[in-house]
């Protein structure tokens, strides 16, 4: 995920305002803070430990909601509301799984993250 999001650059800032290693937007960060009750500055997203903590927290919420890593990756990239609308469209979804992601950027993102997960898993097995 981090390789795909920021190429391991903790100071990365996207054109959309996503920050740090896992490219978390301010809005997502504030939403996550509202769920866990912490009160810390958005600038802490440039701190690798904080960024990974909240990025993985967000991934865990998405996995709890969707139960499929490909859907989690799509929601992380395109947003939950967009993915929820895709999941209700039979041309995009089959048996509750995204099979035809309409945004090429998101489809490519899901493929890149999935490939990276496979590659890093192989490295961990060594």
Name these PLM-found stretches.
Residues 2-126:
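Catalytic glycan-binding domains that act on GlcNAc-containing polysaccharides
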């Amino acid at each position: 995920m981090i390789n795909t999001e920021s190429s391991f650059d903790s100071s990365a800032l996207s054109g959309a305002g996503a920050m740090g290693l896992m490219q978390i937007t301010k809005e997502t960060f504030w939403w996550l803070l509202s769920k866990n009750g912490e009160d810390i500055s958005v600038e802490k997203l440039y701190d690798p430990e904080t960024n990974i903590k909240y990025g993985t927290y967000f991934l865990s919420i998405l996995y709890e909601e969707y139960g499929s890593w490909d859907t989690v990756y799509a929601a992380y990239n395109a947003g939950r509301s967009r993915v929820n609308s895709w999941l209700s469209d039979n041309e995009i979804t089959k048996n509750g799984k995204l099979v035809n992601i309409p945004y090429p950027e998101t489809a490519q993102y899901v493929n890149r993250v999935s490939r990276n997960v496979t590659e890093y898993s192989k490295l961990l097995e060594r």
